[in-house]
UniProtKB/Swiss-Prot annotation:
GO cellular component: host cell mitochondrion; host cell nucleus; virion component
Pfam families noted in UniProt: Flu_PB2_1st, Flu_PB2_2nd, Flu_PB2_3rd, Flu_PB2_4th, Flu_PB2_5th, Flu_PB2_6th, Flu_PB2_7th
UniProt-recorded name of the protein: Polymerase basic protein 2
Site (Mammalian adaptation) location in chain: 627
UniProt main location, coarse: virion
A single MF term (Gene Ontology): RNA binding
Native species: Influenza A virus (strain A/USSR/90/1977 H1N1)
Native organism taxonomy: Viruses, Riboviria, Orthornavirae, Negarnaviricota, Polyploviricotina
Short sequence motif Nuclear localization signal: positions: 736-739
Subcellular compartments: Virion; Host nucleus; Host mitochondrion
Keyword Secreted applies: no
Gene: PB2
Amino acid sequence: MERIKELRNLMSQSRTREILTKTTVDHMAIIKKYTSGRQEKNPSLRMKWMMAMKYPITADKRITEMIPERNEQGQTLWSKMNDAGSDRVMVSPLAVTWWNRNGPVTSTVHYPKIYKTYFEKVERLKHGTFGPVHFRNQVKIRRRVDINPGHADLSAKEAQDVIMEVVFPNEVGARILTSESQLTITKEKKEELQNCKISPLMVAYMLERELVRKTRFLPVAGGTSSVYIEVLHLTQGTCWEQMYTPGGEVRNDDVDQSLIIAARNIVRRAAVSADPLASLLEMCHSTQIGGTRMVDILRQNPTEEQAVDICKAAMGLRISSSFSFGGFTFKRTSGSSVKREEEVLTGNLQTLKIKVHEGYEEFTMVGKRATAILRKATRRLIQLIVSGRDEQSIVEAIVVAMVFSQEDCMIKAVRGDLNFVNRANQRLNPMHQLLRHFQKDAKVLFQNWGIEPIDNVMGMIGILPDMTSSTEMSMRGVRVSKMGVDEYSNAERVVVSIDRFLRVRDQRGNVLLSPEEVSETQGTEKLTITYSSSMMWEINGPESVLVNTYQWIIRNWETVKIQWSQNPTMLYNKMEFEPFQSLVPKAIRGQYSGFVRTLFQQMRDVLGTFDTTQIIKLLPFAAAPPKQSRMQFSSLTVNVRGSGMRILVRGNSPVFNYNKTTKRLTVLGKDAGTLTEDPDEGTAGVESAVLRGFLILGKEDRRYGPALSINELSNLAKGEKANVLIGQGDVVLVMKRKRDSSILTDSQTATKRIRMAIN
């Protein structure tokens, strides 16, 4: 009332009325800002003056039954007045304190499970180590980074279905959980969250954090894996950086890292096989990373790296529309060009056919350690602005841009012949020939490029052919900048096509990627990569090829044996024997193969010489194209452990050792498996081979006359039965087979049946 009187008093003075009515309100915008709309314009001020009131909080009426009207100190906790405009009660902040101290306690068992990502973050920070702070200029570039450590890689839709199924299992709505990961996660979470009292909405939010990759486009200098991004605000400022080592790793970073390594290995291997595309697909489908199928990871994981993108393209997935050259990702930001074939002469007068891009174009170039902006016209570099972590990185970027520009002075700077080949010994295309040449040595290129005087532009500096910086002169069109160039932020994915040589093109036919662009960097994967394809056996060197080849034969012995007998050529051509050939000295491969094939043919022809162990041991040698020669060998050489080691044609050696008693095969001391059937090389071996073509029916049956010797057996007619004397004077009943096709199985079953018949 006092205030109203005061205002009336003020209004009665003419001066007040005049000020309020005559003064122009020229800041209408400000008045509007603070008076229109439901959005609070100054939340902190609002909070402050609300909290200065006695009852700033509203609560459900039921609270009055759960909280006393006054606390121990006699302070009122809630007002008897209703909140205007709703049927809630006005509550004092002291009520919150009372509730926290005296309110009901629920079980906390679910908290670490629901807030798993937070608990894990605390652990990582607790065990992380922060090093010294350095003050220096930070070259940050915006990159798309993963801001959410410890997540699975489900798509938003897949995650939504999982969350609905876990949090609101009885809600209506079609939910189809199809992928392996969806089903596993749903089962796991349902078990974890039984009797959970935390609000379903909160649970849903937290599950989303755990299931979906969240990315942001952030300025980063340094590590980009999610465990570094979560502390970005602590590790880099505008002019300082703090060293930090994370206190733990998270699966999503490990998956990204291992995926890149697997993809690189697979692309490199596929590139040298007879049908690269088919091989690549076969390997992607048969590889597991950390126990998950690689193809499933490729479908969900947004990692953009050359090899990964080639694998995705092969699977028909969309990839980024940027293209790769010299390890840099190029994104055209303006302009356009048409392609035309042109013949050019190198400094060595070698003719190159290059596809010239005619027209003005601008690109951003982003590499691991350097970035640049490139403006070019037809076969002319107009401007290149580079920034990089160190001199070496800047040189790499300049070389790539100069080659990409296709300028004549670059082509004329070639000294010597260009004859670089890829892993499959095929010549590289001309642009990659030039690139390799100058990556080896760029001296002549920089010397021939030409220099120009430069203007003083803030943040830019000149660079001379010897890589020293200057404020007066610079290589023509080239400047070094303190600022990085941001990665292209648009995450659009386009439909691409891939040819059998793994060249990936967009729909206009521009080559985006090729195996030449796949990095040669070797790393050690964080998660176990299991390559089931025989093409990847050589990844761990010659020993692994040897062991894997013999393991494969033993695992598939049943089918191998039948093919050995009935269709040897098909067996020799199996791709599983391909890697083995690289271990056999080139000069002698053909002779070995001819020798072994002849030996095998004799085994098939001459009864009594079928010898399982020997077949297994020599089989891989028969896979090479055979040379006919009369040469006999008592041992065959394989190149392992840096030298030639011998495999004895008859008997054991350190390379191939079969233990008759344990039936175990060791190759170079490594276990290569157990033979399930018994290749006993004594009498049984001979007998089983001799009894090929005969079915052993059981013990001696006197009705079929006296026991014949093994040699007399050949006189039996098909279907005729007879007793036969074998080995140690035992007699068994046999019948000559009516069909020849089943002959092979006899030699396996004979041994077992003889034993049964005798015992």
